[in-house]
Structures are given as C-alpha cells and as structure tokens.
Design a protein with these regions (language model features):
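Short acidic (Asp/Glu) patches
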Residues: 48-51, 86-92, 108-112, 255-257, ...
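A short beta-strand-loop-beta hairpin characteristic of the jelly-roll/cupin
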Residues: 67-99, 274-306, 346
Length: 366
C-alpha cells in the first residue's frame, strides 16, 4: 500500500440502461468514490436524440455543461444540434442552440434545462461538471394552491423509482422507459413535442442577452508540440469567461514523452484525468503512464496508470512530471483545475544548495 493510494482512483465501468447513452460510461461521482473530492462529473457519449432534465438550480455551487465531439481525436467534428434553456425565472427562460463544441457555466441560482438533443448525426460527448463532491439540485413546482415549492434532490438521498426500499444507483431504467414513451407519443400526428412546447414558446419572446456571457465556444488551438494532437482545446477560466471557476485542457497524447515539471499548488486542488480518447469507447486505454507524488519533493512515490484514472492533487502535494512510458493509441490527459486562474509553485536549487520557490501563474502581471 502506498501513502497516497487514496488520491488515485481507477474509474469503474458503469454499465447502465440510459436511453441514448453509450454503455459502459465513465463517471467520477465525487465523495462517493474518493473521500474529500470536490468534483463530480461524467463522460457521457450521446448517441441518439433525447430530452433530459427539467429547469432547476444549484444553491451554492457552479456547474459546467460541456458539449464536444465524442471522439476527442476529432474534437471539433460536431454534427449535432442541442437546445438548452437558461434564466433567472423558470417561466421566462432563454434558448441557446449549440451546433459546435461549447461549454456553459451555470452559476448558483441560475435556472437551466431542459436539454434537448434534437439532432445527433454523430455521437457527441456531454459532461455535467459539478464543482463539489456531492451533486445536488433544487427543483421548483407549483402546488394545488398555486404557491411555489422548492424540492431538494441529490446524490445519496434519491430513492429508486422501481423499489423505494433501495437507493437510486442511476441505472437509467426509469429514464429510458419514460424517454421511449415520450418518443412514441411524439410520432403521433397531434402530439409533437408537447412536453417541450412551453419552452419553445418562451423562445419566441425578445431575448435579453443577459446569459450570453455564460456560453463559450471552444476555439481550435494550433501548436507545434509533437507530443499532443493539434489543434487541441481547453477552457482557461477567467481569460475565457469572467468569474468562471474552472481551468482545464484536453491533451491528446500521441507518443511516449515526459511533460510538465515537479510542482505543487498553494491553495487549490487539481485533478488529473487520464481516459480513452473516444468517449464512446471510454475504457479503451492502451498506454502506461507514471507520475510521482509526495509531500516532500525529495521523497516521492511513483504511481503507474494503465486504465482510465483520476488523481486528486490536494494543496501543497508535490507532483510531476508525467511520463507517458508507452502509448499504443492516443489517450486523453486532462489537467483539471477548479479555479479561474492556473498557478503552480516550483522549487529551484541555488548555487549554495539552498532551495528557492518560484510561483508561476496566469494571474501574474503581463
């Protein structure tokens, strides 16, 4: 057993019955999988048209909705149309139609959803990234007296629809049954998209543009580093979207190499994700990766990764570099930093043998 084993988690194969989602899928469910984790996110490949969720909010935590090509080797090949609604008033939501790789920031108390995957000509990836260890949401409903009520739902408290004696394990069976019933009704001449009609009626009202600032289209980033596929994509926090609390990259590793340097983060966690490059085949991971971890930069432990994995890097834990010892097929290396600016501390040895610590960050004066 290693000292830092609790920080290294192999993502399990999640077999499920969710209609329109590739199975198995990769899902990191925060504290239910790793104590003290502060991120909860999935890697879902959407393969069919479907509708999910109702308007809801999150009380105190940002969420990010990510839509990209499912094959990260062809990140910008996005042959789909997705409708998403955002707004402060659940009866006056504004429609956003996504036709290219996009990330949406959902700040606390902003209503969002439904999500209508109304055309899927080629699989796309959908990730709901929740910046807390336990996912939760607040739903609004109007009771018989016409008064608003707000119900809480979250990981660990939802009960199984089929068997109330059991906790919901998100198998997707109830969703799939409802989705298939909805699609059958939609085929009828008079039914149409009855469930979605009120939301499309809202879209006919004048737009305020208030929520445009929360929607960011990924930009192709051409580069000359032969270790990573070009162009690549990323979301660099404040430099892309003011007040955002997320900074991460999609690095498609092409060959054996060593990247990064030994460093630590002063006050922010980091998560390092290693996954298959095609989200429809998430667990196809033909590589061997090594990384060193330790509280003391002179005494580090080496961890070897041979399957999809997430590593939690708490503040002040030294880590790196990352050595891709064998790359049989491209893999996705995703450094994930839940803050608006990225920063790290490195150690430099002076000529007299003493140590000097240097901060490097995107928030430094230009």
């Amino acid at each position: 057993m290693g000292k830092y084993d609790d920080l290294v988690f192999t993502i399990p194969k999640e077999f499920h019955d969710w209609y329109g989602f590739a199975s198995p899928r990769g899902f990191f469910r925060g504290t239910t999988m790793m104590p003290k984790a502060r991120v909860y996110m999935d890697f879902t490949a959407v393969t069919k048209e479907l509708v999910m969720e109702v308007p809801h909010t999150h009380h105190a935590v940002d969420e990010y909705l990510v839509f990209t090509g499912a094959d990260l080797n062809n990140f910008f090949e996005f042959d789909a149309e997705v409708d998403v609604w955002l707004g402060e008033d659940p009866e006056r939501l504004e429609l956003f139609t996504i036709t290219e790789p996009t990330i949406i920031r959902v700040p606390p108390k902003l209503y969002h959803c439904p999500v209508n995957f109304r055309r899927i000509s080629k699989p796309i990836m959908f990730s709901a990234v929740y910046l807390d260890g336990d996912w939760s949401k607040i739903n609004r409903r109007v009771n018989a007296e016409g008064r608003e009520e707000f119900t809480y739902d979250g990981a660990g408290i939802r009960r199984c629809v089929k068997n109330r004696a059991q906790e919901c394990v998100y198998c997707g069976q109830c969703f799939s049954e409802a989705m298939k019933e909805f699609l059958e009704k939609a085929k009828e001449e008079s039914a149409g998209d009855e469930r979605l009609l009120p939301f499309y009626e809202m879209a006919k009202l004048p737009r305020t543009g208030k929520y445009d600032k929360y929607v960011y289209t990924f930009k192709p980033e051409a580069h000359n580093n032969p270790n990573f596929l070009s162009p690549r994509a990323g979301f660099r926090g404040w430099s892309e979207m003011e007040e955002s609390r997320l900074w991460y990259l999609y690095n498609l590793v092409q060959r054996e190499c060593t990247v990064g340097e030994l460093h630590m983060h002063h006050a922010v966690e980091e998560y390092l994700f290693f996954t298959g490059a095609d989200i429809t085949d998430f667990f196809n991971f033909d590589a061997e990766v090594e990384i060193q971890l330790g509280e003391d930069p002179d005494h580090l432990e080496t961890y070897t990764i041979t399957e999809p994995t997430v590593i939690r890097i708490p503040p002040k834990l030294w880590h790196g570099p990352v050595t891709f010892k064998r790359v049989g097929a491209p893999i996705n290396f995703m450094p994930f930093y839940p803050a608006g600016n990225y920063g790290r501390v490195i150690r430099q040895t002076q000529t007299d043998g003493s140590s000097h610590y240097l901060y490097k960050g995107t928030d430094l004066p230009k």
